[in-house]
Structure formats: C-alpha cells, structure tokens
Amino acid sequence: QIELPVWTPATTEAFATYGEIDQGAIAQPVKMPPGVFPQFGGLEITTSSTQLQALTDAVVYLYNYPFDCNEQIASRVISIAALRDVLSAFKSKDLPSPAAIEASMKADFEKLKRRQHYSGGWGFWQEQPWPFLTIHVAHALARAKEKGYKPDEQMIQRALRYLRSIESHIPPWYGEEARPAIIAYSIYVRNRLKDPDPAKAKRLIAEAGGVDK
C-alpha cells in the first residue's frame, strides 16, 4: 500500500511599488486578493531606498540557480560581470561575498571550458553546438574579461574561431530574419573581444538594404 499526499495548489506572488518621497509620508493600501488560501503563505513587506534591490534579487537568484546548462552559466556570468560593481557599492547583505563570487566565476569558466566543442562552440550541455548559444557564451566571457576576470584564453580563441565562420554554423532551416541577426550578434561580440571585422559588418548592412531601410 502506498500513500500519496494531495497538496493544495498554492503559489506566491510578489508586487513592487516605486516612487519618491521628498518630504512627509505616504500611505500604501494593501488588500487581500480574492481566491487566496488563507492557510498558506502570508504577507511580507520590505522597503528599500533604491530600485537596485530588484537587481540584487535577480543576481542572487542566478547565483544560486541549481541547473547549470551552458546558457544558464553564461547568463550568470554576464549578470555578475555587469552588476558586480554597482551592487557591491550598496553593500547589500543578500549578495555573496567577493571571495564567493570570484570562486563561482572560476568554477563557471572551468565548466564552460570542459564543455566546449572541438569546433569552438557550445551546446546547451555537451551536444552539438548551437550558433546563438555559442555567441551568448562568448559574450559572457567578453564581459567577464572586461571586468578583470580571467577566463581561459585558449577557450576564448577557440570561440573566436567559431564566430569568424559563424555563417557555416547556421543551419539552413533557420528563418530569413534569424540568420542576419545571429551574424550581427557575432560581429558585436567579436568586437568586444578585440577582434573587429568592419568589412563583414558593412557587407551585412548592405545585404540588409542599408541602415535607413
């Protein structure tokens, strides 16, 4: 005999209100929404002097995200590289310590290095590479490098080799709009990695009918 519990389907919702109070005070009405299960959850109210609190929550969420496919790792690397300095200036108690962030970045670089395909690209895990995903990972490495982190240089060079020939990696069944968008993204990331290709950029613009089209 097996007993299986049947739980009440319940979830939580979060709402945010932003504004400025130069002087005086403000009253914020709170009303219980209809259809709630009063035996679950509760009401939690937090305040912050800056809208950066929402960014802190997002970075912490990505930092602790348990499912590490290459797309998710790259997204975490980008968020930490882009927001580390700003969020650290506010000394949020919810942020990991600088040493923990540094260790996390190093671990993510190692995972990406191990999972890189011999062609220089990345799949979601260790399967055949996907062109857009490869550019996304390379973009993350570029952002991290700009912030002083040290991803493996050979990994970056292999990724650049893939990006330089991105056209050959785009499947023929991709849509007409997807192909030039992917090529444009690859040119942008190559430029951030100090590998500019203005000639390819000009050709892409010309093929699209010019910048005023």
Give the role of each language-model region.
Residues 1-177, 183-206:
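Extended, solvent-exposed functional surface patches
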Residues 206-213:
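Non-catalytic carbohydrate-binding regions of carbohydrate-active enzymes
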